[in-house]
């Protein structure tokens, strides 16, 4: 990405770039927000996952050039322009300015954290202030007092297309009210307090209105279930996760899928193959649900302030129709494993924490009297109760807990 970064600081949508128009692309044109932001998100994810600060050092100047590009094209209030394709292949259309502004805020948040890690105090303050500015602009422009997402109407007409006299006028504020329009600001931390609660409620209402199916595209899908779980609606997240109707994660599986497809219906038993254009059968975007499976179903999460899983946040969410869930992965300190199994009166939770790390555990339990340590008690800190949850600190080691309803 650095080698092919455009002179204006923008990135293209994918690399390497091959061919020439109309069948290929040149790298002298900016890509789309949601794609270009990989220039910020990838270094962030590498650093957070592995703790290697060198990737930030090597990529810093490139990231600054990209942020400068975004700042030049932003509106005076801090919101972003409506350019690009937005939530690609979504069932419901979400205003592109809304999604671009949400990503701009997220970029600023990551830049502030990475600047602080590099000892760039002034830059850390600059990007933190930018995040606050864009966050305020997002709420002012795209959220009404009832917590519903809105946006200025922009007419789209092909040349020669007749004007609909009943259509809104350009600039009229109209509802957006899509799943993506709530998932992004919720996940990116743009909504606080009552507005956050209202947005979660509107998100759930939209899901229910669509028969408990998702309507998100490439931009919204990765954040949909995490936003629900962080908003206290694990029940809805599990309903979506297990849904088999179109569109859903399991719908393609029932049509014979063994890979992630570009479209939910790239192939159906009833109708066969879809259009040959944009119909990839090996297209990871919707596979982002795997992140929720690890971070919420199994509950293995990173601590942003202590990268590389030096400190692990464990918040397993037991739910759905599954009898058990278990899994893990290698961290720089060793393998972390987490799993739960339902019982007649609750569940049993097992976890292994690598050497030279610690963890904060949050269990779904009515109170400390409902939690029993079956093994590893010597490494378990005191229990604390908080709103239907029990919290404790863990040292490295293996543990087993019994939680009763």
Each model region followed by its residue ranges:
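Short alpha-helical "patches" and their helix-cap loops
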Residues: 1-2, 55-61, 119, 195-208, ...
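Catalytic cores of carbohydrate-active enzymes
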Residues: 10-17, 71-273, 393-395
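Substrate-binding groove/exosite segments of carbohydrate-active enzymes
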Residues: 1-71, 85-86, 219-221
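Alpha-helical support elements that line or immediately flank enzyme active sites
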Residues: 1-4, 43-56, 180-192, 221-231, ...
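Acidic/polar, glycine-enriched structural segments that form the non-catalytic walls/loops
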Residues: 48, 53-55, 67-69, 115-117, ...
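Short Gly/Pro-enriched turn/cap motifs at secondary-structure boundaries
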Residues: 30, 173-177, 281-284
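A structural signal for well-ordered alpha-helical segments within the folded catalytic domains
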Residues: 37, 41-44, 102, 109, ...
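Non-catalytic C-terminal accessory modules of carbohydrate-active enzymes
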Residues: 235-405
């Amino acid at each position: 990405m650095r080698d092919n970064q455009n002179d204006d600081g923008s990135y293209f949508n994918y690399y390497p770039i091959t061919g020439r128009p109309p069948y290929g692309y040149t790298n002298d044109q900016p890509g789309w927000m949601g794609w270009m932001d990989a220039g910020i998100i990838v270094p962030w994810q590498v650093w957070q996952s592995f703790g290697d600060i060198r990737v930030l050092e090597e990529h810093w100047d490139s990231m600054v050039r990209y942020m400068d590009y975004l700042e030049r094209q932003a509106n005076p209030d801090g919101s972003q322009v409506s350019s690009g394709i937005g939530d690609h292949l979504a069932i419901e259309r979400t205003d592109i300015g809304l999604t671009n502004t949400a990503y701009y805020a997220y970029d600023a948040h990551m830049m502030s954290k990475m600047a602080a890690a590099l000892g760039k105090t002034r830059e850390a303050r600059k990007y933190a202030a930018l995040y606050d500015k864009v966050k305020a602009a997002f709420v002012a422009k795209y959220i009404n007092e009832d917590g519903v997402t809105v946006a200025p109407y922009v007419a789209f007409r092909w040349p020669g297309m007749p004007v609909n006299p009943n259509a809104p006028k350009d600039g009229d504020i109209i509802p957006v009210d899509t799943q993506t329009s709530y998932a992004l600001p919720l996940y990116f931390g743009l909504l606080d307090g009552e507005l956050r609660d209202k947005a979660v409620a509107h998100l759930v209402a939209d899901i229910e209105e669509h028969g408990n199916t998702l309507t998100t595209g490439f931009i919204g899908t990765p954040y949909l279930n995490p936003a629900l779980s962080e908003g206290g609606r694990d029940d809805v997240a599990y309903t979506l996760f297990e849904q088999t109707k179109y569109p859903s994660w399991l719908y393609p599986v029932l049509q014979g899928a063994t890979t992630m497809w570009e479209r939910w219906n790239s192939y159906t038993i009833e109708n066969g193959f879809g259009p040959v254009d944009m119909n990839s059968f090996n297209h990871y975007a919707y596979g982002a649900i795997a992140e929720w499976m690890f971070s919420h179903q199994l509950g293995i999460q990173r601590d942003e302030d202590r990268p590389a899983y030096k400190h692990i946040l464990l918040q397993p969410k037991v739910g759905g129709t599954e009898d058990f869930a278990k899994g893990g992965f290698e961290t720089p300190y060793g393998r972390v494993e987490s799993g739960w199994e339902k019982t007649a009166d609750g569940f049993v939770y097992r976890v292994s924490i690598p050497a030279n790390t610690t963890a904060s555990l949050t269990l779904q339990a009515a109170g400390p009297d409902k939690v029993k340590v079956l093994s590893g008690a010597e490494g378990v800190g005191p229990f604390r109760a908080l709103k239907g949850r029990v919290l404790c600190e863990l040292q490295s080691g293996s543990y087993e807990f019994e939680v009763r309803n």
